[in-house]
């Protein structure tokens, strides 16, 4: 389709900074060689950052994801596709091999339906097999023009990733990382940690951009692409990209196109959402769902008690107990109060305030709600209940 998306090949570097990381890196190197991946030991990581060991993965690439998706949308509409925006799908009913896809004001029918929405909305097995995380990125202008001409990744926990990009003629270092589970750590602190790290390792002139995104981590490390488990034939899903949506999103198009057209695809069985119990990810499966159970119970206790709404600072949100009610309260800069139920409409966990993006985030399955309680990110389908004070 000739999509102009700033595509360019760049070498990728993965580097360690201590003995434990080096041992892990050596395992990755050996596994990569066995899999036929182009990898070799490197004398540089492309950055002004000290390292213990480093390996180069040749002919990696980067491209502009928005330009790419806009190009795909253009190609789709040119062959007759229709894109309907700002429409929440509430339900899918199937009758006589036809799927009735319902939204607030009507429905449409389809032979095949694909959930490409992180995890599908509602309560389903994929909510349990994926953990929601957020990642953070800074766009940094450097004093010394020491921008990397590669893709680099360290092995810290959480890790950092590095690349450069030109915006309106100005080159920027893109520094990402500080990942954490949605609704857990403080997003403001995540950005602060990245700023501190940047200042310690680069000659920073200014930080001109910052943003965050949500992704889902599958329990066994592989995405789920294929027929939706438990649903009627012809309902497909693609999720669990683990932050690699630019790769797995495109791969989804190939796999699902083959499945819909009755063709074989060598990756379909490996990535099937109905694959056998994820033995390799069983420990992670237990850990993540224990965390969900913990927040479901613990967050119902330890709520801040306030006597007056005046105690809440402007521009902030908190889950509090006020007049014997547990509430998610936000006070805007003019002092206007918005009070909501803090109970996520997905499975009943208690939401937490995200001060950076002004949202209520669920620590269990990653649902996010706007200040007025409307759904921003699934899997919840319904808004938080609103109270008048």
Task: Locate each region found by the language model.
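Dinucleotide-binding Rossmann-like beta1-alpha1 core, especially the glycine-rich loop
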Residues: 1-43
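Helix-loop-beta segment of a Rossmann-like dinucleotide-binding subdomain
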Residues: 4-14, 42-74, 176-181, 239
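Helical element adjacent to the flavin cofactor pocket in flavoenzyme catalytic cores
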Residues: 23-26, 30-35, 54-112, 116
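C-terminal catalytic lobe of FAD-dependent flavoproteins
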Residues: 31, 156-157, 181-285, 340
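Phosphate-binding active sites in nucleotide-utilizing proteins
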Residues: 60, 73, 77-80, 86, ...
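Flavin-dependent oxidoreductases
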Residues: 91-164, 304, 310
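Rieske [2Fe-2S] iron-sulfur-binding domain
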Residues: 138, 319-389
